[in-house]
């Protein structure tokens, strides 16, 4: 993934976040015979032909479980998600390679396979247990998003009412243990105070696996400039998400209106399963889709504030329904790179954005492990 690109070469992508495992669970209870990932599967945003078309050479597969699952149920469901990623790679062994290290990623790409890594989404998946964290690392997890849409006992979520104002002492211990094990601390979804506390505590690069720039779209899931400005000192990477709510203020406002409707009906605006039907019900009121240029604006803003070495891509495909026109699935990355090339990005710049920066951060994270 580190070879020199020419203007004609596809830009290799190591994407930070894809929710295909949960989509397959919901669609067919993990039955790989019931889904057409080789021929092309229109019911999802990710399949093998479209990964190839998008230049995706590596993917962090999210092993997300919803916050409605707690305690042992959340832990069990996360193990089931991890097991699915193992089975996915074993089933499509000619196309995918399960990876645990940056060296593994390089080896997979050298054989023409998509490097497949595991990312956990939400601290509820470990049930406040460092033992569970260690076990999931042993099973291949290489990042943990500290929260999802709801607070955990040791960290505040960006989309919940703050309780702690940041990380508790257990939360700080979680960050330190992740550093020791060799796992990325993922700060997407967390409250601003958690971002700042984690950057203070972490002795290894952090990532935002799927977040965009708050200066351009005022959404709590996006990253404020003062936090982006800390990434050079930490070595971390903000991997820009392509979800419409994060790229366009008009879309963010439409989303917030749906949250208000959910609350007025006695539903939980933090829960996707409560909000998604309202979004679909109100789809006729949705703004025009964001553009590829909107996605490029966020990438360029992160570059301007944090520096070229600290920006990547984390599409969040199969984790959302709304994306820029032309980038509705994993085949769309080349359109982003074409737009950035038009704006003056060099082939070397694009190689860093697509995969080089997160691989460098991964090597640094591994070196910091004990």
Indicate where each model-derived feature is located.
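N-terminal hydrophobic targeting/anchoring segments and the immediately downstream early-domain regions
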Residues: 1-167, 218-370
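Charged catalytic cores and adjacent phosphate/nucleic-acid-binding surfaces used
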Residues: 4, 202-204, 213-215
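Histidine-centered catalytic micro-motifs
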Residues: 13-20, 190, 208-212
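Catalytic beta/alpha-barrel core
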Residues: 96-99, 183-190
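Short, surface-exposed connector motifs at secondary-structure boundaries
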Residues: 114, 175-183
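Distinct, well-ordered alpha-helical segments
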Residues: 129-133, 194-204
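Active-site glycine-rich loop that binds ribose-phosphate moieties when present
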Residues: 165-176
């Amino acid at each position: 993934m580190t070879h020199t690109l020419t203007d004609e070469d596809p830009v290799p992508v190591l994407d930070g976040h894809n929710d295909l495992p949960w989509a397959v669970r919901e669609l067919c209870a993990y039955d790989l015979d019931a889904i057409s990932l080789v021929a092309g599967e229109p019911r999802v945003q990710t399949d093998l032909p479209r990964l190839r078309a998008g230049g995706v050479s590596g993917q962090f597969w999210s092993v997300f479980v919803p916050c409605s699952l707690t305690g042992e149920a959340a832990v069990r469901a996360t193990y089931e998600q991890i097991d699915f990623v193992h089975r996915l790679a074993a089933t499509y062994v000619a196309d995918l390679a399960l990876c645990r290290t940056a060296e593994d990623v390089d080896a997979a790409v050298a054989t023409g396979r998509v490097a497949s890594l595991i990312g956990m989404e939400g601290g509820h998946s470990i049930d406040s247990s460092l033992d569970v964290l260690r076990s999931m690392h042993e099973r291949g997890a290489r990042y943990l998003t500290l929260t999802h849409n709801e607070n955990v006992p040791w960290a505040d979520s960006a989309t919940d009412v703050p309780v702690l104002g940041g990380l508790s002492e257990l939360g700080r211990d979680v960050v330190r243990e992740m550093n020791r094990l060799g796992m990325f601390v993922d700060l997407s979804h967390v409250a601003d105070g958690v971002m700042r506390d984690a950057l203070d505590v972490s002795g290894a690069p952090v990532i935002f696996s799927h977040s965009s720039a708050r200066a351009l779209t005022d959404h709590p899931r996006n990253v404020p400039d003062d936090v982006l400005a800390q990434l050079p000192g930490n070595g971390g990477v903000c991997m820009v998400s392509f979800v419409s709510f994060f790229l366009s203020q008009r879309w963010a406002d439409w989303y917030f209106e749906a949250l208000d409707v959910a609350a007025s009906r006695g539903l939980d605006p933090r829960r996707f399963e409560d909000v998604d039907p309202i979004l679909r019900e109100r789809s006729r009121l949705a703004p025009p889709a964001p553009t590829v240029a909107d996605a490029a604006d966020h990438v360029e803003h992160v570059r301007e504030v944090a520096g070229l070495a600290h920006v990547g891509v984390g599409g969040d495909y199969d984790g959302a329904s709304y994306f820029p026109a032309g980038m509705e699935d994993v085949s769309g990355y080349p359109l982003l790179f074409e737009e950035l090339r038009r704006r003056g990005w060099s082939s070397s710049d694009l190689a860093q954005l697509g995969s080089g920066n997160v691989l460098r951060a991964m090597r640094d994270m591994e070196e910091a492990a004990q």
